[in-house]
């Protein structure tokens, strides 16, 4: 911790501000500096990123620099940006510097932790693997989440990433009575507002903390807001021994914000114009997300894929840190098959018979085999039609189409616009349902019966109703 001192602004380029200090008074890297913006009268926080010589430090602003002028006095706080932690933050909404933005009064029962913290050492980390049940069939069966792991939701714009994240927040709060921390990183302000209102309506807000640095905010705020949310999650893991869910929407915007300030900080850009420190920035965030002997942080990260190009450096760098990848397919979304999770591209490191059990593993692989065979046959069907297939292949196609529809599920958060009540399906029911479809028990049922239902029993009931209405 450096001593408090006062400097003067000598240069302003967008969100990057250079501040000159007296000899021997230089702040440390990541120290928070405070300047009063004469235009607004409010405090503006600047974070020190570089020491550039001549007693000048280069900083990134956490809010708009409009109104700042050269010569303004800047005070060094002598410590990094700090986030509020403790029971008092539950049910509240914050910005990057830990200020409440929900107009719900002052914070009580809290303390402050710096947002830059070391990752837990190897000796503190827990190595046993447990499954985290999400209640979503396609995820629990084909890409199960490890407790304390990192899960990526990959998809372009408009394929349902945010709806899936919101559904999981709801399931963790209501079904698991767990705490969720949501970091809105560079996404639409409207979505943040919708999330807040929906969580209030669903009664899950009291178990959740929301931290926002949205699209309209400067890159400094978007670059650091994930660390603020992570610090709050670390408190619940390390002090209260809780299993916490950390949602980051969107991790691509974290990288994007870093690349915006990187050039202004004087760094040479690397591949596709990203910052040369891309891997380091990502590693500093991701390595802190882990299970310890006290508790766990399971992270679900929505990852926007620019132009649907999965080889772009931002999603590609994120891939290396993930334990499970959920790939959202535009083709499935276009067919109305929600959640639009690609059952063949989505993977999990824990889909292993030694971890999930032999039955779960065999059913999951059986489902993928049938779907892969159906995919291989689609060209033949398009050219020659179903009639040219062998009886065995016809049966595979029928089962695959039922499986495809049974992988869909009505969500609680989409209930308002779909009109179908949401369902939470336990893993045992999910495995039983798909196992019975693979065994051919429901070969005589219409495929429409499997669309947007929860358990296999619901599909059977729906089939009876469809048959009755067909008779009438």
Curated annotation (Swiss-Prot):
Keywords for this protein: ATP synthesis, ATP-binding, Cell membrane, CF(1), Hydrogen ion transport, Ion transport, Membrane, Nucleotide-binding, Translocase, Transport
Membrane topology summary: Peripheral membrane protein
GO molecular function, one term: ATP hydrolysis activity
Broad class of the protein's primary localization: membrane
Function: Produces ATP from ADP in the presence of a proton gradient across the membrane. The catalytic sites are hosted primarily by the beta subunits.
Subunit organization: F-type ATPases have 2 components, CF(1) - the catalytic core - and CF(0) - the membrane proton channel. CF(1) has five subunits: alpha(3), beta(3), gamma(1), delta(1), epsilon(1). CF(0) has three main subunits: a(1), b(2) and c(9-12). The alpha and beta chains form an alternating ring which encloses part of the gamma chain. CF(1) is attached to CF(0) by a central stalk formed by the gamma and epsilon chains, while a peripheral stalk is formed by the delta and b chains.
Protein name: ATP synthase subunit beta
Source species of the chain: Fervidobacterium islandicum
Gene: atpD
